[in-house]
Amino acid sequence: MTSQTHTLPPLPYAYDALEPVISKQIMELHHQKHHQTYINNLNAALSAQASATASNDVPTLISLQQKLRFNGGGHINHSLFWKNLTPPGTPANDIAGAPALREAIVSRWGSHEAFVKAFGAELLGLQGSGWGWLVSKGGAKGRLEIVTTKDQDPVNAPDVPVFGVDMWEHAYYLQYLNNKAGYVEGIWKIIHWAEAEKRYTAGVENPLKL
């Protein structure tokens, strides 16, 4: 029995394209090293799972679940993350290009500014490693909620991850050091609102095929 092999998705922009918000050095390490490691470990776990399934090795199958969840979640989360970022100052970074999502945000939080403040508070309140997400509950065009997930836990269906922010230290520390608030403030300059609009209105069929 063979298992599916996952590969590192290419970035939709150059490694230095998100500067000055996220440095080229961080993007290279984050994409080529951290994301690649999740993929390597996921592929190894899937291969072990296939062998254990073929031999009906139930204890091994059980022991592999945490590795699959952690590394599979890391692959899913990062694959979504790269696509919900865009170079600063581009049309895709303008929330005007996300009319349905903007209307839903204003309806839920009163204003775009109030949403940004609430989202930032959730990100800065996250203890340890994890992610912050804007989620459409129950599917496309659902009620918007700000949620956090620990470690590499992904957003689970039927909820839709409209966009996410990586709050692991490897996402910002080389540039911002302990100024996590600076990273959170800057992230809005590179959010891909057009991509967020697409996810909000149409959902995410398969994050590993985005």
From Swiss-Prot:
Main location: mitochondrion
Keyword Lipid metabolism: no
EC numbers, comma separated: 1.15.1.1
Domain of life: Eukaryota
Chloroplast listed as a keyword: no
Catalysis performed (reactions): 2 superoxide + 2 H(+) = H2O2 + O2
Gene giving rise to this polypeptide: SOD
MF terms in GO: manganese ion binding; superoxide dismutase activity
Protein's UniProt name: Superoxide dismutase [Mn], mitochondrial
